[in-house]
Curated annotation (Swiss-Prot):
<keyword id="KW-0963">Cytoplasm</keyword>
<dbReference type="Pfam" id="PF00069">
    <property type="entry name" value="Pkinase"/>
</dbReference>
<comment type="similarity">
    <text>Belongs to the protein kinase superfamily. BUD32 family.</text>
</comment>
<feature type="domain" description="Protein kinase">
    <location>
        <begin position="20"/>
        <end position="238"/>
    </location>
</feature>
<keyword id="KW-0819">tRNA processing</keyword>
<protein>
    <recommendedName>
        <fullName>EKC/KEOPS complex subunit SPAP27G11.07c</fullName>
        <ecNumber>3.6.-.-</ecNumber>
        <ecNumber>2.7.11.1</ecNumber>
    </recommendedName>
</protein>
<dbReference type="GO" id="GO:0005524">
    <property type="term" value="F:ATP binding"/>
</dbReference>
<keyword id="KW-0597">Phosphoprotein</keyword>
<dbReference type="InterPro" id="IPR008266">
    <property type="entry name" value="Tyr_kinase_AS"/>
</dbReference>
<feature type="binding site">
    <location>
        <position position="48"/>
    </location>
    <ligand>
        <name>ATP</name>
    </ligand>
</feature>
<keyword id="KW-0158">Chromosome</keyword>
<feature type="binding site">
    <location>
        <begin position="26"/>
        <end position="34"/>
    </location>
    <ligand>
        <name>ATP</name>
    </ligand>
</feature>
<keyword id="KW-0808">Transferase</keyword>
<keyword id="KW-0539">Nucleus</keyword>
<dbReference type="GO" id="GO:0000781">
    <property type="term" value="C:chromosome, telomeric region"/>
</dbReference>
<dbReference type="InterPro" id="IPR000719">
    <property type="entry name" value="Prot_kinase_dom"/>
</dbReference>
<keyword id="KW-0010">Activator</keyword>
Length: 238
């Protein structure tokens, strides 16, 4: 009979290490905590932890956490294999719900867009939108669905080299579903409009580049229009 997971110990270990080592908590969400730490001395990395959920049965919690860790690690590996920029996977401890990965030092796309003045939009943002469109097309062509494709989940190598790096595949999956891919695009559209209210013309560049980069994307783009209409109806109804 398998040993019952020590739920409290798993929770306290993470928080004690954060406190004692004075690590930098980058983000704390409902499912995971991301921490800036070192993989080995001098090598900065990002540690993503999935703390135990006290309200969930310990064995079920560990199984779900392990599954999500493995799915995310496989998505990162698949992205690298097909040439999509994302953090390099260093190490995974699925039983503890932890993934060590490359630290990306550049700004996130959300912050980069907000810093751009109106006179620089054509010069800086249009090329970035086209690049995002082509990279998302590459993702979907290879049946990679991000699951939370927002401007906060895209980093840049630097301000001077605005190449998108996709992060946080915690809600991602491998899926052939046109619906899943269409929802990815819709989430991106909503995120762009939230980041930059006058983003409609910019998003056209994302869609154009997506269509040009993936010749079999017509069905997904048709489904995107359906998803978009459903979203607008929900907004109108409230």
């Amino acid at each position: 009979m398998s040993e019952k997971p020590d739920l409290r110990q798993r929770c306290s270990d993470i928080y004690r290490e954060i406190k004692e080592k004075k690590l930098t908590v980058v983000k704390q969400g409902a499912e995971a905590i991301t921490i800036k730490t070192e993989f080995y001395p001098g090598e900065v990395c990002l540690l993503k932890c999935r703390p135990a959920k006290r309200w969930r049965h310990p064995i079920l919690d560990q199984k779900l956490s392990r599954k999500r860790c493995l799915v995310e690690a496989r998505l990162l590996a698949k992205c690298h294999y097909v040439g999509i920029k994302c953090p390099m996977l260093y190490f995974i401890d699925a039983n503890r719900g932890q993934i060590y990965m490359e630290w990306i030092d550049g700004p996130c796309v959300r912050d980069y867009i907000r810093e751009i003045c109106e006179c620089e939009i054509e010069k800086k943002l249009i090329p970035l939108m086209k690049r995002i469109g082509s990279e998302v097309a590459k993702m979907h062509k290879n049946d990679i669905v991000h699951g939370d494709l927002t401007t906060s989940n895209m980093m840049l190598e630097s301000h001077n080299n605005p190449v998108p790096i996709f992060i946080d595949f915690g809600l991602g999956s491998v899926s052939e579903s046109e619906e899943d891919k269409a929802v990815d695009i819709y989430v991106l559209e909503r995120a762009l409009s939230s980041t930059l209210p006058e983003s409609e013309s910019l998003f056209h560049h994302v869609l154009d580049s997506y269509a040009q980069s993936w010749k079999q994307s017509k069905a997904t783009l048709r489904r995107f229009e359906e998803v978009r209409m459903r979203g607008r109806k929900r907004t109108m109804i409230g």
